[in-house]
Amino acid sequence: MPADTNPAGDIFGGWLMSQMDLAAGNMAARVAQGRAATVSVEAMQFLQPVKVGDEVTLYATLVKVGRTSIRVHVDVWARPRQSDNGQKVTDADFVFVALDEDGTSRPIDLEA
């Protein structure tokens, strides 16, 4: 973790964003029943810093399924290890596109 900190000693925002992309991507791949690629991250803002040692919890919620795209909202909460009180530290919407084996966008089969 010290490698994942910014000059202020807080967790680097890029690390947190990568964890969010993984959480959203897991849901998108399940919905797509296969490969899904991130095409955009929307309206992300950091509300509070995350300290080294904080317990970080991510919640991914399916927002919308289009013909080839999937929108997932991710909320991130952090809780200091010595506390029972967590707080929301960031959230964002991630948009994915379902891909076929050649890496081309494909329709999502909602019937399966």
Spans of model-derived segments:
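HotDog/MaoC-like acyl-thioester-processing domains
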Residues: 51-52, 63-112
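Hydrophobic beta-strand-centered segment that forms part of the acyl-chain substrate-binding groove
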Residues: 24-59, 63-65, 69-71, 87-92
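Bulky hydrophobic/aromatic packing residues
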Residues: 15-16, 59, 77
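Short, well-ordered turn and helix-capping elements at secondary-structure junctions
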Residues: 2-3, 41-48, 78-80
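Hot-dog-fold acyl-thioester-processing enzymes
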Residues: 1-40, 97-112
